[in-house]
Amino acid sequence: MRDVDARIGDDGPVLEDWIAAAKTELGIDLDVDVPGLLDMTREVAHGVARPAAPLTAFLVGYAAASAGGGPEAVAEANRKAAQLALRWAAERSEELSE
């Protein structure tokens, strides 16, 4: 197991290890688009609210599973969530400027 210092500023190996462990624990075999999911959660965290990011990630996973699962379903749900977050932020910005 890596020590705490290894986790600070070096997300790559930690994320890879965590995702592998989580997939094993959850009994799933799926390639994870880490950059895409992190981009989506960034848009949600900054455009909506920080707590909305993990909740939206859950909803993306649920939507993908409901659509039959697989990388394409995840990518589509992820794309929709990211676009919604961008629209949400733009609409809120317009409301505040009025």
Name each model-derived stretch:
Residues 2-8, 17, 22-26, 39, ...:
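C-terminal binding/interaction regions
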Residues 29, 34-67:
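Amphipathic, hydrophobic secondary-structure cores in small proteins
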